[in-house]
Amino acid sequence: MSRIDKWINEKEMPNLSNAERLIALLYDLGIASLDQLIILTGWNAQKINQALHDIRNRVPIPATFKRDKKILAMCKKGEIKLSETERLKLEASLKDKKAKLDKEREKWLVAYQAHKTAKAYYTLGAEGIRYATLMRREPFTKWKITPRQQANHYHGINEILVRLRKAGIKENDWLCGREAEQELYYYFNRYKKRKKLPAKTKLYYRPDAYLVLDHQHDFFIEYDTSSESPSKLKRRFQNCLKLYQALKEVEAKLMPPIVWVTVRESRKKRIEEIAQEVLVDFKQDHDGENIIVPPSVCFVEGEDTKFFAGQIDPKPFWG
């Protein structure tokens, strides 16, 4: 069973509420839309919306807010009389209390849209992250909070998994970038110890996700929104090669192929060109060494599903 599924499965985690299950899932996904949550949980929209509501309601409505809201409603119905000054003062007070309540609730769950007609995205706030780490017995750090500016990136990563599910392909496992990083650090720390590198040396490269289809097919996943500059892409490819060289000394056999997914054909070609350029330079810089080059392919969104289903056999740009 996939690690993200165990939090949703009532037999695996019988004591969790639906709100807690969704907190755990959002922690893995980073940012997700309602339609993605429907596919990945198997719940209907009503059940998900109720769970989202319950997460936000972990911050209860203050009694004074309820009281003032009731008074204002009675005033509008003519059941009680307030002077114009009293009414305006009450409305201002309610508006202020509502803003404070929303701010506190966003510490658990943030819902936002790029504009009024855009798709809504959901992500955990600091308290939601803290609660998720408690359930997982992980340390809490603020860097685990997902920046909302990366909504398109996280949505694109999640769509890779959603397309698989829609195609009837059930993964054996799916790790978000954070969890994949934790797995890699085990081997990277062994490498650091062997090379006597400083303890603070950071992992050279972290994939966006790790997909296991079965015991013979697993992949690192990279999703590209086309927002990264060529220089950033070059550093990413260079750091990827750097990590594969480092880990070949401790556990090279566990390093899987890499699947890149991007938004359009022209971007795909550019990614492949940059990757080839970096590889040529890397080999020149490591002349005489046995370079480990991970088999890597790139797809426009949608083609990746055909690849995972075994329907196409693309030419890799590396490996």
List each language-model region with its residue ranges:
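Electrostatic, structured charged patches in enzyme active sites and in nucleic-acid/phosphate-binding
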Residues: 2-10, 16-17, 40, 58, ...
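Nuclease-adjacent, charged terminal/linker segments that flank catalytic cores
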Residues: 1-145
